[in-house]
Amino acid sequence: MSSQDIPEENLPAEQDRPHGAAARPADETNPFADPGLPPHEPRVQDVDERAAKRSERTVALLFTLSMLATIAFIAAFVAIDVDKSVYIFPLGHISALNFALGMTLGVALFAIGAGAVHWARTLMSDEEVADERHPIEASPEVRAKVHADFKQGAKESVIGRRKLIRNTMLGALTLVPLSGVVLLRDLGPLPGTKLRHTLWSKGKLLVNMNTNEPLRPSDVAVGSLTFAMPEGLEEHDEDFQNEIAKAALMIIRLEPDSIKDKRELEWSHEGIVAYSKICTHVGCPISLYEQQTHHALCPCHQSTFDLADGARVIFGPAGHALPQLRIGVNDEGYLEALGDFEEPVGPAYWERG
């Protein structure tokens, strides 16, 4: 656009200036005339009450859809099994519960947003206003203006007159948080005493984790390290990982004279001792053993336990000794547990004390 195309009243005013001086507009803060706001054009909802009613019903329908989607979210959470899968093209086989929760919660939130946008675009006041910049300091006049603007906004939103919109909006906003409340159920149930007990009980055979065969005393050589689990626990079992995380054992054979802890000696069989394989720091499986020092080392954070002295902690961040399992030999000559651990295995937790 050339200067000939600009209306004369919008051009900067001419001003006398010495030769070579920089050109400066007549008004540095506003070099062009303010064209002002265009005239307001009423919408169809502003002049036709029937159109306004249709918009009101549309907004209410969206808010109602949000409420129904929230109810569907809760129903899906309760009714759909966590292991159920469903084929969705092109996603393939996915969790039916996750798909249902995601879709219903997405619809619930989208419907609230869409309803609010449609309400603002069709029923709220759409007149443009200009507000001059003002100091940041909130003077009494400014605070009074804020209150007045709030009242004016409430009036222009027609929320007092459009009770159907108000009620359905409040209903949708009230129900949506229930989705998060329902999800709190996944924080429970409380573990109760599950962390205090394992699969070990009196008479349970010690099974070699590598060969899946019951252990005899002759299978454990002096200075060797053997990993064991309770009989009857199979890798394909649904709860295998949860159970082995508590019941895994380290079987070590020491010279009885080298055992320093009296209880450790009493709970052993001919120098064979059984300790929990789970580190008491953060639950890593212990797998390193020093034959000469009888020290077991956790590879995660280097917690070190003296297996000849009650598996006490001699180095590292672990908080307490490894629990020992009392063992013996049954009539058939196999190593067996004489009960469960006397204390919870693994890391400490609040209820452990």
Swiss-Prot record:
Disulfide bonds: 284-300
Cofactors named for this entry: [2Fe-2S] cluster
Keywords tagged on the record: 2Fe-2S, Cell membrane, Disulfide bond, Electron transport, Iron, Iron-sulfur, Membrane, Metal-binding, Oxidoreductase, Respiratory chain, Transmembrane, Transmembrane helix, Transport
Region (Disordered): 1-51
Top-rank lineage group of the source organism: Bacteria
Any GO molecular function: oxidoreductase activity, acting on paired donors, with incorporation or reduction of molecular oxygen
Rieske domain residues: 246-336
Ranges of biased composition (kind: Basic and acidic residues): 40-51
GO cellular component entries: plasma membrane
Membrane topology field: Multi-pass membrane protein
Free-text comment on the cofactor: Binds 1 [2Fe-2S] cluster per subunit.
Entry keyword annotation includes Transmembrane: yes
InterPro entries assigned: QcrA_N (IPR045603), Rieske_2Fe-2S (IPR017941), Rieske_2Fe-2S_sf (IPR036922), Rieske_Fe-S_prot (IPR014349)
Extent of the signal sequence: none
Transmembrane domains' residue ranges: 60-80, 99-119, 164-184
Subcellular location: Cell membrane
Residue positions binding [2Fe-2S] cluster: 279, 281, 298, 301
Chief place where the protein resides: membrane
Family from the record: Belongs to the Rieske iron-sulfur protein family.
Task performed by this protein: Iron-sulfur subunit of the cytochrome bc1 complex, an essential component of the respiratory electron transport chain required for ATP synthesis. The bc1 complex catalyzes the oxidation of menaquinol and the reduction of cytochrome c in the respiratory chain. The bc1 complex operates through a Q-cycle mechanism that couples electron transfer to generation of the proton gradient that drives ATP synthesis.
Subunit structure: The cytochrome bc1 complex is composed of a cytochrome b (QcrB), the Rieske iron-sulfur protein (QcrA) and a diheme cytochrome c (QcrC) subunit.
Protein name (database record): Cytochrome bc1 complex Rieske iron-sulfur subunit
